[in-house]
């Protein structure tokens, strides 16, 4: 009986050792990656303090950004980095395919806070070429929950499919990326938040940009809206410009 008991204890200890070793082998690479982020943060903080000893003290007092950025969640489109801005200079909201949907309380709460509390002067809606969300909306695969979100882009595809369908797939995606930005500028301009802000004379402008991951350049789609009347004009002008593109009318 004693021998049997010792065998059980030995087997349990061996199993525990193997399990712990296996766990360590699995977790160690993950923790190494995570710890790299912490080390990077320490290095960044140290260098910034060396360049500007009072930076974090000033930053901790308040934020007063002049810009709100509504962009795509894509990791290749880092808003502050590609605009050359520092912490505290850009208020940021990101979602898949940079959509402004009137039922999205998350986005609208960000916009309201930015406009009414921070009093930003500029709201930039920025898409990017080769957007995976736009491409998925075109190809219409079954992705799960996100399919409901992509319906907003799919509606734009149906709206302009007669012309966009003439383009090769890559250009079709990029053109729809541009159309999507213009439509989101229009959506935001028609929100009660922006309508109220313009009505009370607040100086806040909406811009539509597209970022090129291939070259790192931001492109202004020239649909900047400063009030409701300008919004309607710029929307019509912007869509007409895109649909009159030589690629669409060879």
Question: Where on the chain are the PLM-derived regions?
Answer:
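Intrinsic-disorder/low-complexity regions
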Residues: 10-11, 18, 39-40
């Amino acid at each position: 009986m004693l021998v049997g008991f010792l065998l059980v204890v030995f087997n349990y200890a061996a199993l525990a050792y193997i399990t712990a070793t296996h766990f360590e082998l699995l977790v160690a690479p993950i923790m190494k990656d995570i710890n790299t982020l912490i080390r990077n943060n320490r290095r960044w903080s140290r260098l910034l303090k060396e360049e500007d000893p009072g930076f974090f003290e000033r930053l901790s007092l308040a934020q007063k950004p002049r810009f709100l950025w509504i962009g795509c969640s894509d990791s290749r489109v880092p808003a502050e980095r590609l605009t050359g801005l520092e912490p505290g200079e850009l208020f940021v909201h990101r979602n898949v395919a940079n959509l402004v949907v009137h039922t999205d309380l998350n986005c609208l709460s960000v916009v309201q806070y930015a406009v009414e509390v921070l009093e930003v002067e500029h709201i930039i809606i920025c898409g990017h070429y080769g957007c995976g969300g736009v491409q998925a909306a075109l190809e219409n695969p079954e992705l799960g929950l996100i399919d409901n979100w992509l319906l907003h882009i799919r509606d734009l595809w149906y709206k302009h499919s007669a012309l966009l369908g003439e383009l090769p797939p890559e250009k079709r995606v990029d053109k729809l990326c541009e159309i999507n930005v213009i439509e989101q500028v229009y959506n935001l301009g028609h929100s009660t938040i922006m309508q109220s802000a313009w009505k009370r004379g607040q100086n806040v402008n909406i811009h539509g940009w597209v970022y090129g991951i291939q070259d790192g350049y931001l492109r202004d789609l020239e649909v900047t809206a400063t009030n409701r009347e300008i919004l309607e004009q710029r929307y019509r002008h912007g869509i007409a410009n895109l649909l009159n593109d030589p690629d669409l009318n060879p």
